[in-house]
């Protein structure tokens, strides 16, 4: 799907550049190295994932970070920006969150017209971290709708987490919101490799 762009050396394709744009689920996610390794093996070219992400931040913050994403000149942008919008103590209204993600997507499409943009839903929330996000699914749906309205891709990782037994899920996400990096690598990275490179690659 992505052809190797030569940089003057016949056997040295340029790296595929990815920006992961999001919250602590990206900043602390730990799944990026596995994505780099898996996608590089699949595409037979280097892959570099850079994160523009900050724990505890919302889509309001993300609006101020679009310049950083654009400056990286990525080929692909992975976006998850709903999780903290939905918290009761940092409450960004559903309408405001939807407007913010729409504005972010419009800016990225205008300024990076060749980039492939993928909006993501990450993992399920539980315990206290879930209780303070009672309408999280509505925020995911709003961000999905804004992506699809623009013809952009949406990847939902939640069903893959929910295939785990309740005990395994609790072990994988001990605080109810942040998966252990090794589990995130096993669940998120392969799904992104398949989506980016095509189902004929990977496992």
Task: Go through each PLM region and give its residues.
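Oxyanion-hole/transition-state-stabilizing segment in secreted/luminal serine hydrolases
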Residues: 31-34, 45, 59-96, 126
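Solvent-exposed, acidic/flexible segments
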Residues: 24-32, 55, 59-62, 90, ...
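Generic structural signal for well-ordered alpha-helices
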Residues: 66, 101-106, 140
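Structural recognition of the beta-strand scaffold that forms the well-ordered cores
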Residues: 17-20, 48-53, 76-81, 116-121, ...
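Catalytic His-Asp segment of secreted/periplasmic serine-dependent ester chemistry enzymes
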Residues: 123-203
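Active-site segments of SGNH/GDSL-like serine hydrolases
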Residues: 80-84, 107-139
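Serine-esterase "nucleophile elbow" of acetyl-processing enzymes
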Residues: 1-55, 65-73
């Amino acid at each position: 799907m992505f052809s190797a762009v030569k940089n003057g050396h016949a056997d040295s394709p340029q790296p595929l550049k990815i920006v992961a744009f999001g919250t602590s689920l990206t900043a602390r996610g730990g799944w990026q190295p596995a994505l780099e390794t898996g996608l590089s093996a699949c595409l037979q070219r280097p892959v570099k994932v850079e994160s523009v992400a900050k724990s505890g931040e919302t889509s309001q913050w993300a609006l101020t970070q679009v310049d950083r994403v654009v400056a990286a000149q990525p080929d692909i942008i992975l976006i998850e920006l709903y999780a903290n919008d939905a918290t009761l103590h940092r409450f960004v209204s559903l309408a405001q969150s939807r407007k913010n993600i729409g504005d972010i997507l419009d800016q990225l499409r205008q300024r990076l017209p060749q980039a492939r943009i993928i909006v993501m839903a990450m993992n399920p929330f539980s315990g206290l971290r879930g209780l303070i996000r009672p309408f999280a699914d509505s925020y995911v749906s709003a961000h999905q709708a804004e992506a699809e309205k623009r013809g952009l891709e949406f990847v939902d990782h939640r069903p893959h987490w929910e295939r785990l037994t309740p005990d395994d899920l609790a072990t994988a996400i001990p605080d109810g919101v942040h998966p252990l990096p090794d589990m995130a690598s096993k669940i998120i990275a392969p799904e992104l490799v398949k989506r980016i490179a095509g189902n004929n690659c990977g496992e």
